Amino acid sequence: VFFDEDATYGKSWGVADYLDYTDTPLIVAAVECNAGANNERLVEYSPYRFDDKQYGHFDGKGKDTLNWFVHEFKPCIDANYRTQPDRAHTFIGGSSMGGLMSLYALLEYSDVFGRAAALSPSLWVAPEALTALVGRCKLAPGTVLYMDYGSREMGNHDGMRKGFGEMCSKIFARGINLTARVVPGGNHSEASWEKQLPFVFHTLMYELD
């Protein structure tokens, strides 16, 4: 997230440089995903069990991961840093599987997270379950979401575009303040996500006291 030398895949989002350059008054606390050879991150960052043609079956442990975020990680950050711990000032964001988790967190813990950024979220993991959650979740007023995907991502462009559009429509229908973008020339990479930071932080910080 912050520096290339510390990044799981060798390239960060350059968040530290961006926040310094723009003088954005924000505390960012980042966690490292499990980058094991057996794709453990797909387990820890999926709220649902799913099967993938390429990788096989995965028991989703994302609910456990999010429970740790809410009940251990966030309280630790709030206790040790000068945060504003209320939901209006508590954001969550990520890309790919982290984007899926960020969207899930915003829907499942609307009392904790007021705003979220889901870059290239892995909506393919469990679209039916996620759609059901969008329909039934209890949302607090003033919920804000940034969500995007790149026009050059993956192989099934038509399927991705259709799924992304349908999910955005359902989210918007729930009254969420949604900023949705198809990034021209964007792909599934940290370098591409870094370029979206101005749009991400503009959405997250918009009209925030």
Enumerate the language-model features and the residues they cover.
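Non-catalytic cap/lid and distal C-terminal segments of serine-dependent acyl enzymes
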Residues: 1-209
